Amino acid sequence: MTSSSKPARKTSKSKSKASKAAEAPAAPSNELSREAPTFQNKVIDKKALRSLVAWSYKHHGTAATSALADDLKDLGFRFATQAAVSISVDDLRVPGDKSTLLQEAEDQITATEERYRLGEITEVERHTKVIDTWTETNERLVQSVRRNFDENDPLNSVWMMANSGARGNMSQVRQLVGMRGLMANPQGEIIDLPIRTNFREGLTVTEYVISSYGARKGLVDTALRTADSGYLTRRLVDVAQDVIVREDDCGTTRSIKVAADDNGKYKSRLVGRLLAEDVVDGAGEVIATRNTEVDPPLSARIEAAGIAQVQVRSPLTCEAARSVCRKCYGWALAHNELVDLGEAVGIIAAQSIGEPGTQLTMRTFHTGGVSTAETGVVRSVVEGSVEFSAKAKVRPHRTPHGVEAQLAETDFSLTVKPSGKGKTQKLDVTAGSILFVNAGGSVPNDTILAQISSGSAVKKSVEKATKDVVCDLAGQVRYEDVIQPKEVPDRQGNITLKAQRLGRLWVFSGDVYNLPPNAMPVVQGGANVKTGEVLAESRQVSEFGGAVRLRESQGDSREVEIVTSSLTLKDCKLVATTTHSGQIWHLESKDNTRYRLNTEPGTKIANGEVIAELADDRFRTQTGGLVKFAPGLAIKKARSAKNGFEVSKGGTLLWIPQETHEINKDISLLMIEDGQWIEAGTEVVKDIFSQTAGIVTVTQKNDILREIIVRSGQLHLVSDSKVLARYTDGGGKMVNPGEEIAPGLKAEAMHMVEAVDTPEGGALLLRPVEEYAIPNEAHMPELGSVKQANGPSMGLKAVQRLAFKDGELVKSVEGVELLRTQLLLETFDTTPQMTVDVESAQDKRAKTIQRLQLTILETHLVRRDTLSDASHGSTHTEVKVADGDNIKRGDVVATVQILCKDDGVAQLPDRKDDEPIRRLIVERPSDTITVDLGGSKLSLKAGQRVVEGDDLGGGLTCPHSGQVEEVKGSSLTLRVGRPYMVSPDSILHVRDGDLVLRGDTLAQLVFERAKTGDIVQGLPRIEELLEARRPRESAVLCRKAGTIKVEQPEGEDNPTVSVNEGEELHTEYPILLGRTVMVSDGQEVKAGDLLTDGPINPHELLEVIFEDLRGPLPTMDAANQAIGRLQTALVQEVQNVYKSQGVTIDDKHLEVIVRQMTSKVRIEDAGDTTLLPGELIELRQVDQVNQAMAITGGAPAEFTPVLLGITKASLNTDSFISAASFQETTRVLTEAAIEGKSDWLRGLKENVIIGRLIPAGTGFSGFDEQLKAEALPHPDILGEENAGYRRATNLRPDYTVEMPLPQSNTAVLDDPSDTELEATRSRHGIEDRTNLAAFARPAAGEELAEEHVPDPGALEGLQEEGLLSQDS
């Protein structure tokens, strides 16, 4: 079918929707060409099948295609049955050259390990090289598997299955017959030990365990990611659910550019789009006109004409309000026809992006690691000399594998001139390529010349990682001078050492001894020592001195205790009584005072703890009651409520008893009444009896009895209200003996008098008062103490404590103890954590009597002798004191000696400012090597460092790495050492001269590794993009166009980058540590270009581009262009993630979503409009408002475009019902209520929630009429001539309530019929010309805002007329 007839056909089709509906659903009959199939004689795989079915569908319709598909299925089954295709173990053919490939890899890795051992490369470079070697071997093995099957067994079942696309892919076949390859550990790091076998050969135990890491990870990932993916889909649906195709053509002139790839191919990116401009070929001939649908044949013609880019219409640039028009959307991919009106394209887009999320996740880890596929390695074809062209600029560069090479800074050409016959080899080198040859150098044939960069700076997303360098031998650390360690303080003031340059750390072998704390070396540095000699000695000395007690040894240590001070209670016996709950200890003094012990012998107590309490019943009451202090009695505010209040001055305590029962039962159980006098033993509530006689007070709440109080005393009925009044205030009065209480009533003893109500009338209750005398000083037993001259001292203190304060009411039935006398321990001049031991000691005179003794002990743990181990050497321990000795302060209790294991020379480490020596080293004879020089003269001096394999001269190679100790005659003594390469910025954990043991960490290498483009990156990356998250360490973006200047200041790690913007304008950009600069000196850059590597912050990109365009262009155009650039970048980024996983999604789906994310702007300054600063509003609306302002001459609103993540965009939709059903329901609804929002039910979700027909698909036609109705003005407004309308000030400009000037006789109607109007006019006597207020209906294109506040007057009028119910 020719393309010229195509546009005409399509437009006629879109005009008559009715005729289209009547036609066959697959495709209208006039489109089926019934073209006969061409004969095809080839193997048909999945791809060919797909195109066959598509061809059939296009040319022969649905019915024929389904019949064809059925026949194909039958054919497949029939022949599969006859061929008996099944998979057996024998079908897994391992390629023969596997062993050769593995051997090559092994050799490469051995060489790398050797380079590492000689300190030529760092640990990181070794690791990278190993992993890259295995990755490459794996790839080569896959090729070999392919070749093997293709050439030797093309009909192999496994090969057919994987190759036809039926099931499985090469990555799985590789694991069956190649090698399983590299695996990751649970932290996601690659283990550099690959699985060399495949499933056919079987795995070793180690390989099996390693591979099970990955398998577990796969299962867990799948489970977690399914949820993630589902949530992503839900957010996408929510943001795009109201995008429906609502019109045929929005008529926009804006478009997006689709560019061909490097090979001039468009693949499927043009198919299904409509052209925005005519496509003209080189000869000026029009290939296709605007609005032509691009089908595959037309796409092929455009490619053939060599057109590099085409402008097409896209949902991104569609100007339809809140929807997409058919022409901008293009084909609906379900049936490759122009999309229908009413199609819910938003939801289709959301599902298309969300659904592959689950597939994404399930692709578990394949190879990971740094892939070298982005760069092409070029080898020399001839032997010859290398020349660079004149404009070549290179700088030294170290590759990730530790190879010294050069990095090209400009584009130039490299030639290899052959030394003999042959053609000159010419090579175009792009900036960023790595060169492995030097200009003027000669190269043999088949040598790697360069790694050519793909030109554009490959944006790798990198992350910082660290790797520890672990020491392989014990010895002393020495730096090479090149490292130049620098002290870097961090925020906390800790200082770390960092290497500034690439260099080596050496460890020179020796026997290192760890010294215990406080051990002092006994030998001098440089002294010769013999096996068994003492190297260091540590002494344990007594801090205070005292009597020594040697305890029995436990395990491998003995305890030496020294009693520094003790305290004995001389006049008290220690008595134990056994009860069923254990032993209770008492102290009994000569005058029969008894103290109950709170601790027991064998325990420890601290300062201020109670040792014993006086057993004393004198202060025990019968019942609860009220506490009153008589004047004179004083207490301290004691710290602990548990122990009560300490008495500071003795005196009298008054106690008024009363019995309180706490009940909490139903009121029906009460057996007495409130105010009644009862006798002792009366049952007050079922099963509860009173202990004393007295007046009852009942407290109840909600028919529940709370408490019953019984107040004992004498009751006197009194009728005089004045007398009663005297005793009602303040809960009664104290009366002394002999005082008159009432006429004719005298107090016999001290009483508390209260007025009470009884069933018989008013009365006075005389309550008895008990007095307790409290002494000034508590009783204190006699003490005897022993104390060292400067040891800690201690004593006992007797304290009286009152349990209650003045005026406190004690609610209780049983009695309470009012006063307790306690013995407290007091220790002085001691550390807070010091404890005192409680012991029972025999009386020196009477052996049968036990006394309580408190002692302060100093304890020393003395270890047994140990035989030598790897780091400590042998130790010998001696205890220098005997049991019962009395020693002085500073006397030695025990010594520990460290003995030498081998003969050698002892050396002490370099010391800094008297820091203690924690290690020492013995250089043994085995740590040096003597090399016989055989008479050759060497230029080596003592102290020089050599590496194994170095040429010593005279045909001698160095047998071992190390340092030259001395050159004597014909022999050379070498101290064995091991070099470790450290890279710049590494953190050094050891200083020059430190002693290290095997397994210690020497340094931490800081390096950047490419994040594995693995799916664990996949979903979170897509989420990051769609949620528009700000990346942690984003790239530095250029803010204004100009020329780059890169400088490297002396002594600084980081280069400085500045952009010369012309006219003396320079902008300097700070480059953070560890950032790679992506631009070179003299390069031209535009606003928004990357200056350093790292992820782009989309918000910053939008802001930068908008600010740059805002000057030369009007704000609206600047916003449109900035949004456009951001949109393409976003679509591209998301596509990259999916493509890297082999998932194809049509661009238009992403465009629909991205359009929703970028549709809003933030108002900066409202100008004369009614918008609010900071408000988020659609760009379209602001444009309309600003156009209106331009007509009226008002100041327009200033705004900046914003990018909203999908969650934010969903919560910021016009429909509050949709937003509330998504997240934060309460907040959304509350805000909507406060703002008085209206929901116009435009999307699908709102309508589903309300329960209406959705405005898509078949429900679209009704919606269509509603749109048309909304577009027309109100009938009343049409008949209006009078200009008496004013705009309501509190409303948004896009929805107006027209209000008449105030008038006395006004009726207000909304949408009335003519007869109603007539009736109203006649009823109110209104003339025809009177103003009528009406709500103006907005036009279809206008925005209907949320806050529509109806005029209260209008509502009242409607209610009066009965056109609106009163309650609505």
UniProtKB/Swiss-Prot annotation:
Catalytic activity: RNA(n) + a ribonucleoside 5'-triphosphate = RNA(n+1) + diphosphate
Subunit structure: In cyanobacteria the RNAP catalytic core is composed of 2 alpha, 1 beta, 1 beta', 1 gamma and 1 omega subunit. When a sigma factor is associated with the core the holoenzyme is formed, which can initiate transcription.
Enzyme type, top EC level: transferase
Compositional bias (Basic residues): 7-18
Protein name (Swiss-Prot/TrEMBL): DNA-directed RNA polymerase subunit beta'
Enzyme Commission number(s) from the entry: 2.7.7.6
UniProt cross-references to HAMAP family, sorted A to Z: RNApol_bact_RpoC2
GO CC entries: DNA-directed RNA polymerase complex
Residue numbers binding Zn(2+): C250, C318, C325, C328
Family stated for the protein in its record: Belongs to the RNA polymerase beta' chain family. RpoC2 subfamily.
Keywords, alphabetical: DNA-directed RNA polymerase, Metal-binding, Nucleotidyltransferase, Transcription, Transferase, Zinc
GO molecular function per UniProt: DNA binding; DNA-directed RNA polymerase activity; zinc ion binding
Compositional bias annotation for Low complexity: 19-29, 1353-1368
One Gene Ontology term from the biological process aspect of the record: DNA-templated transcription
Cited Pfam families: RNA_pol_Rpb1_3, RNA_pol_Rpb1_4, RNA_pol_Rpb1_5
Region (Disordered) location: 1-38, 1340-1368
Cofactor(s) annotated in UniProt: Zn(2+)
Signal peptide: none
Protein species of origin: Synechococcus sp. (strain RCC307)
Superkingdom as given in the UniProt entry: Bacteria
Function: DNA-dependent RNA polymerase catalyzes the transcription of DNA into RNA using the four ribonucleoside triphosphates as substrates.
Co-factor note (free text): Binds 1 Zn(2+) ion per subunit.
